[in-house]
Amino acid sequence: MTEKISILIVQSNPQVGNIDKNKQIVIDHIESNKSDLIIFSELMLTGYPPEDLVLKPAFMEKVNNAISDILNCSKNSNSTIIIGTPFLEESKLFNTALVIKKGKILHKHHKMALPNYGVFDEKRIFSNGEQVSIIEFNGIKLGLFICEDIWVNDT
């Protein structure tokens, strides 16, 4: 196990729908930091809540292009990156945390507890993830959760 791990938690204010600006925030942090682990927020690439924007194919194409750009940027970094993004898999749209290192997606955690009350209507847009994600990072087991996952008993 590593004795010391440096972790950067990025608290930014991503703009809903401004994928280019949000992606640039991510790339700037990857290029300028040497942290072992860089963690970005839920739905960092799209801003929160993206609502019906993620249902538009052209918007999701921009999201996928941004993910590709971030993967490419990560090739030159030793950091492991965790970033929130909408992610289409097997014809289902998920609110996902991607774990990225050296140009590869190492793991995907799909949010399990989708809120559907008050101003939140994630169940209308996203599919539920089905399992808790545990990853190994520098000899340490880490659980991945997205927002409401952490305080709902059945997740």
Language model: regions and residue ranges:
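Enzyme catalytic cores with a strong preference for nitrogen-chemistry domains
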Residues: M1-T155
